[in-house]
Amino acid sequence: MSSLSLYTVQAVLILDQQGERIYAKYYQPPHRSDEGHQLLFNSVKKQKEFEKQLYRKTHKQDSEILIFEDHLVLYKEYIDITIYLVASLEENEIVLQQGFSAIRGALDLILNSGMDKKNIQENYDMVLLAIDETIDNGVILETDSNTIASRVSKPPTNEPQMALDLDKGFLGAWGFAKSKFQERLQQGL
């Protein structure tokens, strides 16, 4: 058994139908000095080359998991995008699958009109938040897609929303004062 670590994910990628990057986030654990990982993922040119080769390998395949260039890759193809989760070969496939399913499920809930390139680009901020809620610096934090989607889509409820309608308040006070004044006048007569 290799070293145990919470840092399981090396990258999360979303590529379009030409293999071009829509979203890419590479993680590097702070305590590991893995030279191969650093050389592969430190330059944008090498990252894009890796993504192109990965897309060519996985495009129109019937599997959901494969070993590619000493990396374990989980992926899912949709209409015009493919989502990838990249990890080292030593990682637990079941944990990775749960994290990957959480990302996919949360994105399905957030992007209720469909998982396609246009919808992802229109809701890019929500996609980023969902991935960041699931994986932080390579550590899978949450595996429940409903929890992730609720954290991303709900506005914060810390402060109560108080809408002051000054016209209504002023008119209400004026009406109250007017009625009290009329009562006093009637009592005085």
UniProtKB/Swiss-Prot annotation:
Any Pfam family the entry gives: Clat_adaptor_s
Protein keywords: Cytoplasm, Cytoplasmic vesicle, ER-Golgi transport, Golgi apparatus, Membrane, Protein transport, Transport
InterPro entries from the UniProt entry: AP_mu_sigma_su, Coatomer_zeta, Longin-like_dom_sf
Keyword Protein transport listed: yes
Stored SUPFAM superfamilies: SNARE-like (SSF64356)
Protein's UniProt keywords contain Metal-binding: no
Membrane topology: Peripheral membrane protein
Localization annotation: Cytoplasm; Golgi apparatus membrane; Cytoplasmic vesicle, COPI-coated vesicle membrane
TM annotation in the entry: none
Domain of life: Eukaryota
Signal peptide per UniProt: none
Predominant location: cytoplasm
GO biological process, one term: intra-Golgi vesicle-mediated transport
One annotated Gene Ontology cellular component of this protein: Golgi membrane
Described purpose of this protein according to its UniProt entry: The coatomer is a cytosolic protein complex that binds to dilysine motifs and reversibly associates with Golgi non-clathrin-coated vesicles, which further mediate biosynthetic protein transport from the ER, via the Golgi up to the trans Golgi network. Coatomer complex is required for budding from Golgi membranes, and is essential for the retrograde Golgi-to-ER transport of dilysine-tagged proteins. The zeta subunit may be involved in regulating the coat assembly and, hence, the rate of biosynthetic protein transport due to its association-dissociation properties with the coatomer complex.
Subunit record text: Oligomeric complex that consists of at least the alpha, beta, beta', gamma, delta, epsilon and zeta subunits.
Family: Belongs to the adaptor complexes small subunit family.
Protein name per Swiss-Prot or TrEMBL: Coatomer subunit zeta
